[in-house]
Amino acid sequence: MRKDLIELDGSEGGGQILRSALSLSMTSGQPLRIRNIRGRRSRPGLLRQHLTAVRAAAEICAAEVEGAELGSRELAFRPGAIRAGDYAFAIGSAGSCSLVLQTLLPALLAANGESRVRISGGTHNPLAPPADFLRDSWLPLLQRMGAEVDLELLRHGFVPAGGGELLARVRPARWRPLQLEHPGAALRRQARALLAGIPGHVGERELERVRQRLGWSDEERQLEFLAEDQGPGNALLLRIDCEHICATFCAFGQAGVSAERVAEQVATQAIGWMESGCAADEHLADQLLLPMALAGAGSFTTPRLSAHLQSNRRVIERFLPVRIGDQALDGGGHRIVITSA
């Protein structure tokens, strides 16, 4: 049966609209056309990371594609049948491996067999969730929703050099709903300063500022030296394990920004989330919406609604028979509720 074409304006939400639309087109079988891709960005059109996601999606479902080239502002994507397999995709820059993998996972979870996906590029990119976030925060929630995915970080890759690598093993699964009302009691905390080709005193200063801002003990703060050929790069990661969720926050060292400022950025993120009492921080909320919609139902609380979440909601409701509601919480925050349309 021929399915109706879904047409989208890609100017509002940047690459998020493209990635979500590709995931939904593959899983629903509905053909897609996006115009004005990243039209409001300083560098509009498809960048390497987006192009890798398009080509990878096309390979996995034998899609017919028009406009799959660097700088393209319009894309037509007509999916075929999803095929399990052993796949390898190279971004060719420090573009985010995490975002490419997130684009492909919904389809591979609906495939007819087990798949392996190896993606090379940036694993720790300031404009995307780091691999640690996927492994520690996002995937455990998807596993509670029925997904069967194992993720290995084979090699770190920072901006601008890239060279990182992820390996995912994906087995077919059925989605089930999940409700996340609050995080529950904190069980464990860990701060990690990653250094690749960067002096140790940078990480020491970052971790000292974490101690000052958050009061975390020596045992809760760790300096981690990576092989120099995986850099140069520096990331400060905070992980907070709670009864119902694991939260991950990250900030990146960069030229002209002090180690103390990097630590202030990530500590402020963590404090804001802890004080809110909500289950999902702003970035995790962005990433939970699509899998919950694929499950057909679910809910979570979050301190605020990002522009990414808002644009993602509009795309999802074009493809799937769901309603995504927003309930204001007393004292601030939002409850996002997904129901059948």
From Swiss-Prot:
Subcellular location: Cytoplasm
EC number: 6.5.1.4
Taxonomic superkingdom: Bacteria
GO biological process, alphabetically ordered: RNA processing
Main localization, broad class: cytoplasm
GO CC terms of this entry: cytoplasm
Alphabetized Pfam families for the sequence: RTC, RTC_insert
InterPro entries for the chain: RNA3'-term_phos_cycl_insert (IPR013791), RNA3'_phos_cyclase_dom (IPR023797), RNA3'_phos_cyclase_dom_sf (IPR037136), RNA3'_term_phos_cyc (IPR000228), RNA3'_term_phos_cyc_type_1 (IPR017770), RNA3'_term_phos_cycl-like_CS (IPR020719), RNA3'P_cycl/enolpyr_Trfase_a/b (IPR013792), RPTC_insert (IPR036553)
Listed GO MF terms: ATP binding; RNA-3'-phosphate cyclase activity
Active site: 308 (tele-amp-histidine intermediate)
Residues reported in the UniProt entry to bind ATP: 102, 283-287
Catalytic reaction(s) noted: a 3'-end 3'-phospho-ribonucleotide-RNA + ATP = a 3'-end 2',3'-cyclophospho-ribonucleotide-RNA + AMP + diphosphate
Keywords: ATP-binding, Cytoplasm, Ligase, Nucleotide-binding
Family listed: Belongs to the RNA 3'-terminal cyclase family. Type 1 subfamily.
Reported function: Catalyzes the conversion of 3'-phosphate to a 2',3'-cyclic phosphodiester at the end of RNA. The mechanism of action of the enzyme occurs in 3 steps: (A) adenylation of the enzyme by ATP; (B) transfer of adenylate to an RNA-N3'P to produce RNA-N3'PP5'A; (C) and attack of the adjacent 2'-hydroxyl on the 3'-phosphorus in the diester linkage to produce the cyclic end product. The biological role of this enzyme is unknown but it is likely to function in some aspects of cellular RNA processing.
NCBIfam families associated with the record: PRK04204.1-2 (NF003246), PRK04204.1-3 (NF003247), RNA_3prim_cycl (TIGR03399)
Protein's UniProt name: RNA 3'-terminal phosphate cyclase
Organism whose genome encodes this protein: Pseudomonas aeruginosa (strain ATCC 15692 / DSM 22644 / CIP 104116 / JCM 14847 / LMG 12228 / 1C / PRS 101 / PAO1)
Gene that encodes the chain: rtcA
